[in-house]
Amino acid sequence: MSSFKIVVRKRRVTDRVIVLDASAVVAAFFDEPGADTVAEQMSGALMSAVNYAEVVAKLVDRGIPDSQILEVMAQLDVEVVPADRDQATIAGLLRAETRAAGLSLGDRSCLALAINRRGVALTMDRAWASLQLDVEILVAR
């Protein structure tokens, strides 16, 4: 079983709201490259419920016990935003612009929330850097 932690720092790279991709939260939990950047942005950030589910699933995949997953997820200082019709529509429409980069529904859900809230999408996925979208993307790795 892997160990993981939550590290939160309070320095922001922007005054705009940060929207966390699942890859960023997983990287922070397991102290992967770029975890410090994520930890600095995590407090008060937003996360789509779709991405929240992805993080839980990744922890399950790594063999973390359910009770530990529930405990660590409850400690996250993030606002989990339910997916609504507007976000779902944006995520669906993003398919054409993101297909070549291989973005998943979860990835597009993060971007849709960032677009909807005029925020900054924070990810570990370098493929996002090549996207030409009307949203700011911060690749932490």
Label each residue range with its predicted role.
Residues I18, G44-M47, L76-V80, V120:
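Short loop->beta-strand "edge-of-pocket" segments that line small-molecule binding or catalytic clefts
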Residues L20-D21, M47-S48, L103-L105, D125-R126, ...:
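Histidine- and aromatic-rich ligand-binding microenvironments
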Residues A35, Y52, D66, A88-A91:
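A general structural signal for well-ordered alpha-helical segments in protein cores
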Residues A24-V25, N51, Q87, S109-C110, ...:
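Alpha-helix capping/helix-boundary segments
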Residues M1-V13, V17, L111, I115-R141:
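Acidic, PIN/NYN-like endoribonuclease modules and their adjacent C-terminal/linker elements
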Residues M1-M47, L59-E71:
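Short, well-structured N-terminal submotif of metal-dependent ribonuclease cores
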Residues S2-V7, V81-L122:
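Active-site neighborhoods of divalent-metal-dependent phosphate/nucleic-acid chemistry enzymes
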